[in-house]
């Protein structure tokens, strides 16, 4: 049996956490031969609820679970963590402006960045799911100077999967027959779902759909899918977010299929003229536990404009919290 991997999850008693933990425990994220130790973090008032989640995890008697710890202290939950899923975040309350939300989360993610810096494995892979995910990831990264900045990522795999599903519905293809979708930019309504390089059953996607549908239906549907789910369900997307977090980590650790890429929000290295340092979603290939941004894709005028609009939002978000960053 392999040595267990330590997986830290914040906000572990929340809706996404509840959908996530049982999938991790059953081997969906790291493989059916990889034991895990779950290190669960919650705020103090939620520890009792977390106890109930742990009871359920125990009652499943998962063969791959080597241990479970719970804590309301980030340093304890992140101790020697190999993977950290930062799910817990301050939700947007009534009357809160985006700036208020950014500042409220800056405090949380600064503290978590410091705790990761002090306690986690030096190779820890960090995925931020809690919104605003891209900038929360940047805040954590800037507070963890001793860790590799490239190991701080944010989730746009949910947007990627949403885009694949929309294109599958439109073309009548199965989602497995759709390759090389791209989400550029922020996990927000400015993101740019790009089908210009996408293949459906080996055929170029742009030739299979009307341009009008692409620009005026597909793009806004993907951008606003989260809001549509809240409207329909009365609660935000939790199971689909958890599933996409599992996809993101699985591909990062175990690799993307040969000849295919996925979408990951990663620290920009200036690729495609995007400002360095912001956490921006790019097409990425993963192998040997590392990722690379796909280079040399041709960018037309329409795409360039959309890519810059979402970049602008990320720069504004960074600037709004810059005074709180080390």
Curated annotation (Swiss-Prot):
HAMAP family named among the record's database cross-references: Malate_dehydrog_2 (MF_01517)
Q: Which gene encodes it?
A: mdh
Q: What is this protein called?
A: Malate dehydrogenase
User: Which NCBIfam families does this entry report, sorted A to Z?
Assistant: MalateDH-SF1, PRK05442.1
Q: Which domain of life is it from?
A: Bacteria
Question: What is the annotated signal peptide range for this record?
Answer: none
Q: Which residues bind substrate?
A: 92, 98, 131, 162
Task: Identify the EC number(s).
Answer: 1.1.1.37
Q: Which Pfam families match?
A: Ldh_1_C, Ldh_1_N
Keyword Oxidoreductase among record annotations: yes
Identify the taxonomic lineage of the organism of origin: Bacteria, Pseudomonadati, Pseudomonadota, Gammaproteobacteria, Chromatiales
Alphabetical list of CDD domains matching this protein? MDH_chloroplast-like (cd01338)
């Amino acid at each position: 049996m392999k040595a267990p991997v330590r997986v830290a999850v914040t906000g572990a008693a929340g809706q996404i956490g509840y959908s996530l933990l049982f999938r991790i425990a059953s081997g969906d994220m790291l493989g059916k031969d990889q034991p895990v130790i779950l290190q669960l973090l919650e705020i103090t008032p939620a520890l009792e609820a977390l106890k109930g989640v742990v009871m359920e995890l125990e009652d499943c008697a998962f063969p791959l679970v080597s241990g479970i710890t719970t804590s309301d202290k980030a340093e304890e939950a992140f101790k020697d963590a190999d993977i950290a899923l930062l799910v817990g975040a301050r939700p947007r309350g009534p009357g809160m402006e985006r700036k208020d939300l950014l500042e409220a989360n800056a405090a949380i993610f600064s503290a978590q960045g410091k705790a990761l810096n002090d306690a986690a494995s030096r190779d820890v892979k960090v995925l931020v799911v809690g919104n605003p995910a891209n900038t929360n990831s940047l805040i954590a990264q800037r507070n963890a100077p001793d860790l590799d900045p490239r190991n701080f990522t944010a989730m746009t795999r949910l947007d990627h999967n949403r885009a694949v599903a929309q294109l599958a519905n439109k073309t009548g293809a199965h989602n497995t027959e759709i390759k090389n979708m791209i989400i550029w930019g922020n996990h927000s309504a400015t993101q740019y779902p790009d089908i210009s390089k996408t293949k459906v059953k080996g055929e170029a996607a742009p030739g299979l759909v009307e341009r009008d549908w692409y620009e005026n239906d597909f793009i806004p549907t993907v951008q606003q899918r989260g809001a549509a789910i809240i409207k329909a369900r009365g609660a935000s997307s939790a199971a689909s977010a958890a599933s996409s977090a599992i996809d993101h980590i699985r591909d990062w650790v175990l690799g993307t299929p040969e000849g295919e890429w996925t979408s990951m929000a990663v620290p920009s290295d200036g690729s495609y003229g995007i400002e360095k340092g912001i956490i921006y979603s790019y097409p990425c290939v993963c192998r040997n536990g590392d990722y690379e941004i796909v280079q040399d894709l041709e960018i037309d005028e329409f795409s360039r404009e959309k890519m810059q609009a979402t970049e602008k939002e990320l720069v504004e978000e960074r600037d709004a919290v810059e005074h709180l960053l080390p």
